[in-house]
Amino acid sequence: NPHFLFNTLNNISSLVQIDQDTAQERIGQLSDLLRYTLYESNHELVPVEGEIEFMSNYIELMRLRCNELATVEVDLWIPPKPMRIVPLLFISLIENAFKHGVNSRKSSFVRIRFKAEGDDLVFTCENSDHPKPDVNRSGSGIGLENLRRRLDLAYPGRYRYDQALRENSYFVQITLRDCL
């Protein structure tokens, strides 16, 4: 996503003036993220560890956009046994959590969890709900629609997708069965 790339580069550029060590770390994360996107995303399945590292790098880069009003909680567990997953499966949900869940003028939160339960993988994302005006809803739902199609193709009959708009928050959970 060019918009993400340009925003991240601008954020890192500003960070260089304040904290060079952190800026250098974020450049490394951006490099890893781009490398993963270029070289791993064309594989049918990837090791879960690589996907977790990708999500972690992405989330850390998105934190650069957050101010003190935003709380970001991340709990990504590497499974005890080797598991494989479709690459970049959850990125649209993480993007949406930051896009719709973080507001620079209001208290906001994003909670992302990923864990193994036996042979299953469970991804959970919850974020504060800051509704946008109806005029700013172009393209709404395309990422989620594409995610559903990818799930149908890659995990037919082997996934569960739950989403809910709760009081002041949006919640989504995806369970992938038999990911060994």
What are these model-derived regions, one by one?
Residues C179-L180:
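C-terminal end segment of the histidine kinase catalytic
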